[in-house]
Amino acid sequence: MSRRKVCRFTIEGVKEIDYKDVNKLKAYINETGKIVPSRVTGTSAKYQRQLATAIKRARFLALLPYCDRHFN
């Protein structure tokens, strides 16, 4: 059996996910630029919603790409 995934944000005691922290957000985006689901990352529902909002804000401000074509 596999080990249960734990939410990193809960362990670290993060109150709110910052959209300007691009390096942390990149860990939750796959190669094609999609947001990785919580069942894969183990993120709790509360932080998954915050994460999605932060990623969308960062995309809007051009801190993160919308799709994989921008990685080249």
Curated annotation (Swiss-Prot):
Domain of life (superkingdom): Bacteria
Gene3D superfamilies, A to Z: Ribosomal protein S18 (4.10.640.10)
Keyword RNA-binding annotated: yes
Task performed by this protein: Binds as a heterodimer with protein bS6 to the central domain of the 16S rRNA, where it helps stabilize the platform of the 30S subunit.
PROSITE patterns: RIBOSOMAL_S18 (PS00057)
Phylogenetic placement of the source organism: Bacteria, Pseudomonadati, Pseudomonadota, Gammaproteobacteria, Thiotrichales
Family assignment from sequence similarity: Belongs to the bacterial ribosomal protein bS18 family.
Complex and partners: Part of the 30S ribosomal subunit. Forms a tight heterodimer with protein bS6.
Molecular-function annotations in GO: small ribosomal subunit rRNA binding; structural constituent of ribosome
Gene Ontology BP term (one): translation
Protein's name in the database: Small ribosomal subunit protein bS18
SUPFAM superfamilies according to UniProt: Ribosomal protein S18 (SSF46911)
InterPro entries, sorted: Ribosomal_bS18 (IPR001648), Ribosomal_bS18_CS (IPR018275), Ribosomal_bS18_sf (IPR036870)
Gene Ontology cellular component list: cytosolic small ribosomal subunit
Keyword vocabulary terms for this entry: Ribonucleoprotein, Ribosomal protein, RNA-binding, rRNA-binding
